[in-house]
UniProtKB/Swiss-Prot annotation:
SUPFAM superfamilies: Actin-like ATPase domain (SSF53067), Heat shock protein 70kD (HSP70), C-terminal subdomain (SSF100934), Heat shock protein 70kD (HSP70), peptide-binding domain (SSF100920). Gene3D superfamilies: 1.20.1270.10, 3.30.420.40, Actin, Chain A, domain 4, Substrate Binding Domain Of DNAk, Chain A, domain 1. The keyword Nucleus does not apply. The gene is hscA. InterPro entries: ATPase_NBD (IPR043129), Heat_shock_70_CS (IPR018181), HscA_NBD (IPR042039), HSP70_C_sf (IPR029048), HSP70_peptide-bd_sf (IPR029047), Hsp_70_fam (IPR013126), ISC_FeS_clus_asmbl_HscA (IPR010236). GO terms for biological process: iron-sulfur cluster assembly. Pfam families: HSP70. CDD domains: ASKHA_NBD_HSP70_HscA. Chaperone involved in the maturation of iron-sulfur cluster-containing proteins. Has a low intrinsic ATPase activity which is markedly stimulated by HscB. GO terms for molecular function: ATP binding; ATP hydrolysis activity; ATP-dependent protein folding chaperone; unfolded protein binding. Belongs to the heat shock protein 70 family. This is Chaperone protein HscA homolog. PROSITE patterns: HSP70_1, HSP70_2, HSP70_3. NCBIfam families: HscA, PRK05183.1.
Amino acid sequence: MALLQIAEPGQSAAPHQHKRAVGIDLGTTNSLVAAVRSGQADTLCDEQGRDLLPSVVHYQADTIRVGVDAKREAALDPHNTIVSAKRMMGKALADIDTRQQPYQFVAADNGMPQLQTRQGLVNPVQVSAEILKKLAERGAAALGGDLDGVVITVPAYFDDAQRQGTKDAARLAGLHVLRLLNEPTAAAIAYGLDSGQEGVIAVYDLGGGTFDISILRLHRGVFEVMATGGDSALGGDDFDHLLADWLKEQAGLTGELDARLQRELLDVAAAVKHGLTDADAVPCTFAGWQGSVTRSQFDELIQPLVKRTLLACRRALRDAGLEQEEVLEVVMVGGSTRVPLVRELVGEFFQRPPLTSIDPDKVVAIGAAIQADILVGNKPDAEMLLLDVIPLSLGLETMGGLAEKVIPRNTTIPVARAQEFTTFKDGQTAMAIHVVQGERELVADCRSLARFTLTGIPPMVAGAAHIRVTFQVDADGLLSVSAMEKSSGVQAEIQVKPSYGLGEDDILNMLSASIANAQQDMDARMLAEQQVEADRVVESLNAALAADGEALLSPAERAELDAAIAHLLTMRSTGTTNQIKEAIEAADAASGEFAARRMDASIRKVLTGQNVNKV
């Protein structure tokens, strides 16, 4: 649906005024901007007719160059020429492989990577902002005025920190972000709406630095992402590095190359890769070595990486509950899908030739432009619904270190879910909320996202307060968590922005661990639940004994109940799940008469001095 804008009376825009909106594919290697003009979405070109903008920024003493001009400086001035900044978005310096990069890295106080340039320290958000500025200038020039809004695409596996970094870059560039859109979903818009295709579609997106696989179901204009997978650190750049290492070996070079020679080597490798798209062999010259690279040699180098992408495809299909033969179409996205081996192996895996009718470099930007045109209000009658999913379950910690899932993984977003919790102790006036992410049963095995405290809870007996905790994930995949005590209305809220991003390996490890430890985790959860119940029973009995034990129990009865409590505490520390359960039942039985006497005493106290006829 269109995003509605409210204005003061007499200041609203003309009802049918066409607004300027663009879609931006902010890529690792190249970026594009597209717009809908005369009802047709297409990419926008610069003065030289080029639509691809290299995602490269060169910092000179007094100016900043972006794109082709910056890329020319990469080999000459690598320390001040930043490429593939998207790989570093939302990550800590410790999480970045700096070995093959020519930059001088400096860690900020918050762990964010900074790069030393002639203009001082810059971070990936600032670098990305320069690219977005350049694309926005192109869009404004093509559309004849300032932009009213943009849709920016991100890999489906970008986590909260990476998405927030992208939004921050857009804000630095002075752009109004209508929505962050998953790249595979954007491709589905470009293909699905144009062809009217209904059914299951696999979107295979292999760009310069990231790989995403999305399993989509298209039905009556509704896009549902059934499952996602991929690798946020795998793409055509890795093909270049493998080929560069091979060329270095052929040239007889050993040890680390200086920054300029390393950049030249990567440029040669990229040129050879592009040449092998159409040729069986490509001549090559580097550092005095002359030879050629055949397609079969290149295929042998990259085949393990391509097969890695197919493993992710298999996992995504399993998550969606589908087999390969149920996929009707396979959409190829990203310049790296031009590699013949990629198309061949993907076709074999899905048992059908992949779709390549739309330029794989342009398809994401075109889909983003279509979505931007709708969100800005140029197509108010459009009936298109996008349903993305979250990759890992979101929940919070409960007593005993248990992880209570509030939003399960692969839930479509935007989404809001709420659960009610209560206090554990009498008179409890605060509750600590610990937000976690993951599939395991115990908090210790999940990823901690954020903590906050709800204070001002009215003192009540344990279990009387009702605290409603709401998890809300917006259309950009960002999470906010709020907690409210229902009787008083006191509340607290936090927006979850994880300090650092999760890599694909981390996500896969978390999923694999949840499967491998499923039975062990469930056993641990059942044990923890019984331990929590034992604590509750002991707390309740001790409070009751302190209040009425001396008045209502004989010494022998008190000794018997004390023994039952002591046995329960022993079992709680050393016993099995069943032994703790039996000890709880024994304590309940031992305290049954005491509970009945307390009830009688309470009733007598209430009725004292009352007229029987009025009761």
